[in-house]
Amino acid sequence: MITAPVAATPAKAASPSTLYQRICLGYSVSAVSISLDEAVDLARTGDVWLFRGHAMADRAIQLATNSPVNHVGMSVAIEDLPPLMWHAELGRALPDVWTGTRHRGVQLHDLREAVIVWAARYGQRAWLRQLDPVVTGEMEDAALATIARLDGTPFPSTARLASRWLAGRAPTRTRQGGGADLETAYCAQLLAVTYQAMGLLPGSRRPGRYDPGSFWSGDNLGLSAGFRLGGEIAVHLPAGGARMPHTPAAPG
């Protein structure tokens, strides 16, 4: 169980609405920092999670995709279900909520547990970007349909990841949107395909053109239908971390 760190002078926690107002006002990353508990309370479908690590595998992905971050995922918060994380990774530390099994590649995880694994076990810094306005029921249905179609898709090798990123930037006369099934999927491509299905990104752009850094505020993502992502919110775990799953896994 995650507990808030003990402070010498307890301060009243900001409500989710107050936190969101601060984010929309454009506070910098250093000015907005919240606990994992607060981040989970804020979770809405379509919110983006960004991770940056310093291990060799993390740096390889950053170099291969020319990105300042090495992993990206999306919050899924549907009705009475606990908040979930939709992403693609090499690890299999957590059971996939959709299938009930542990596997590599495209996965749907408990949001809190996924952030704990990435921040505490893999040594990653975590940031949250909230999507505004709230998505519609039809957009949530499109996200769930994408989850049903792509959950379990394998994660590509680092070499294939780099080649796909380069291919995504090559000019083409053929429209390649997010409708086609994927043989493999890395995290940013998965998020792009899901956003395209939800109508948040144009379907005319290749999903392979996106890398984790495309979803960082320093890039011009250009969402559709008047949607926007707020600034990065640094998310911190409580002092002492949390108990990790026992299954060995490697980040991706």
What is the role of each PLM region?
Residues 1-252:
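Cysteine-nucleophile amide-bond enzymes
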